[in-house]
Amino acid sequence: NLRTRLWQRGIRLASDMVPNHTGMDSSWVVNRPDLFVQRRDCPSPSYTFNGENLSPDPRVGVYLEDHYYSKSDCSVVFKRVDNQTGDTRYIYHVNDGTGMPWNDTAQIDFLNPEAREAVMQDILHVARNFPIIRFDAAMVLAKKSIRRLWYPQPGHGGDIYSRSEYALSDQEFEAKIPNEFWREVVDRVAKEVPDTLLLAEAFWMMEGYFVRTLGMHRVYNSAFMNMLKKEENQKYRDSVKNTIKFDPQILKRYVNFMNNPDEDTAVAQFGKDDKYFGVCTLMVTMAGLPMFGHGQIEGFTEKYGMEFTKAYRNESPDQNLINRHWHDIFPLMKKRYVFANVENFLFYDVWDNGGVNENIFAYSNSAGNEYSVVFYNNKYDRAQGWIKQSCEYAVKVGEGEEQHVEMRSKSISEGLNLHAEDNKFVIFREHHSGLWFIRRSKEICERGMYIGLNGFEYQVYMD
């Protein structure tokens, strides 16, 4: 009853699922070999399979290509032999086209409707046991990825050795997989296990596609980590502006993170000083789902491989780092209800001497009678300027066939519900320093709000 006990404490139990492949020694490889991408002949005369039989079942032999053992080549297939009939198949390893094959895996063939339904049933089974499912490497099952990797267009070499032999025309490809698999997953889960939250790990700049077109509930937002780490601030600000121009609700579906098990640790990427805490402040105060990596708060530097059963470095938690989280970050997390929604979210350009300073992130939000304004300078340079009018965002107007989208913008004074009257003042507290400020409401209404920030400085105004 672990799931029930967690739910009583406000925690949802999540499962990680790999829908794209199985292990090369899985029960499906033994009992349902037709579900995999395969061929009857060996794709290369240099491949040999004389090593140990890796199958757990005596009915079937499974052989890794010999050059993996000598680390002198990396075959795209392994060999499966039916020991009763002699039937021999060469099943492809998983391969995302960016590196070597994953040589302990077997790639499921998603052009096979039987394979798609088998994976679908497994997903539904997991959903009945876990209220959250995280899909590993979900982007490789988008149709354009299946096309690029496994069934290229005629005349194209393809990204994986020997797959050009299995080229399909557009018409043939669409006939075999008319719908996006993930769209079908979202619809089936909504119908059969409706309280399940689906979370996709999707890279290759496909995050927007997964939420806009495929309807995925949450999607990893790798741009947050990568662009802020590299201080590609204009790029990330543009991505936020483009998102709210299309549909601000999409911001809520992004999972923002500073590291994950496949990446370097947060300490390695962002350090332990102001830049780390500035980006972490963005992570917990923007709409979307903030995700902390294992050991991030403690400042651990070891990157754990998936085969690790324990940590190999004897690391001690950095108490100073933990204390700063308690002071700067955790109180903001208790106010997530102020930051989590987008109905009142406004994103601002910071203007200085007639130009926009792209290094400063500035936005406001509110919930009920609680208001917030967040500033962060993601550059080791002094920066200052004014915010007054928000960037444009989309609003759906009307209903049914009459519904259309309008672009709107609000001022900072509207965002904070201020009035331009001489006898009105606004009092607010800066969270990091604990200092209180008082400003004339009329000044903010007429001129906007001024901000001056040192390199990597962040300020959060609340109360």
Located regions from the model:
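Carbohydrate-binding surface patches
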Residues: 352-415, 462
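Single, function-defining residue in the core of a domain
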Residues: 13, 17
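Alpha-amylase-like alpha-glycosidases and glucanotransferases acting on alpha-linked glucans and related
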Residues: 1-11, 23-332, 341, 357, ...
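Flexible, glycine/threonine-enriched loop-and-boundary segments that flank and lead into catalytic domains
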Residues: 236-242, 342-368, 430-446
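Active/binding-pocket-proximal capping segment
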Residues: 300, 390-395, 423, 431-432
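Substrate-binding cleft and catalytic face of glycoside hydrolase catalytic domains
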Residues: 18-22
